[in-house]
């Protein structure tokens, strides 16, 4: 292992944690880096990641309200996005993310700003029955998806594909691949 020195000092506590006063050093495999101290810290770190714990790419949007993760949202309302209320809405924005791997427009901190998954895997509220691989669209239930019905198709209405089966005619949170149509 090499500790590449730069102009600042880093100390290892022996457990793979690197405490850096102003710079990050190469640590041990799977190590955790604490940047700064309780009075000096960083707001942004530019890093190269080869893997991520979470599985979606999201973007911050200002909503009409603060929506729960798994809620299907569309462009419209008084702000940028609002909850879906119609079947097969062609204004789909995505699904409110639980904890995105990558977050665009992260500087948006306005009231009711939420991360909306644009692609990847996220939990989504769905009305069954839904089969694995089904294309999903918005339902009449606010913020809830359902299996695609070709008779109600409108361009732009597909949210993604179901990664799970749900056979009951009730609402449940399941994993969905967003943006895969």
Question: Which residues does each predicted region cover?
Answer:
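Intrinsic low-complexity, repeat-rich intrinsically disordered segments enriched
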Residues: 1-65
């Amino acid at each position: 292992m090499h500790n590449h020195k730069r102009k600042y000092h880093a100390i290892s506590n022996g457990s793979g944690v690197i405490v850096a006063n102003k710079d990050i050093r190469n640590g041990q495999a799977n190590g955790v880096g604490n940047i700064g101290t309780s009075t000096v810290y960083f707001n942004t770190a530019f890093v190269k990641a080869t893997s991520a714990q979470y599985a979606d790419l999201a973007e911050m949007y200002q909503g009409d309200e603060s929506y729960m993760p798994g809620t299907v949202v569309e462009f419209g309302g008084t702000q940028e996005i609002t909850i879906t209320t119609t079947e097969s809405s062609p204004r789909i924005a995505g699904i409110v993310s639980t904890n995105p791997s990558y977050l665009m427009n992260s500087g948006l901190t306005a009231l009711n700003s939420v991360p909306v998954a644009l692609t990847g895997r996220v939990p989504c509220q769905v009305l069954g029955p839904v089969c694995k691989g089904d294309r999903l669209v918005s339902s009449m239930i606010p913020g809830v998806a359902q299996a695609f019905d070709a008779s109600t198709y409108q361009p732009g209405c597909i949210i993604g594909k179901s990664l799970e089966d749900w056979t009951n005619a009730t609402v449940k949170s399941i994993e969905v691949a967003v943006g895969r149509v």
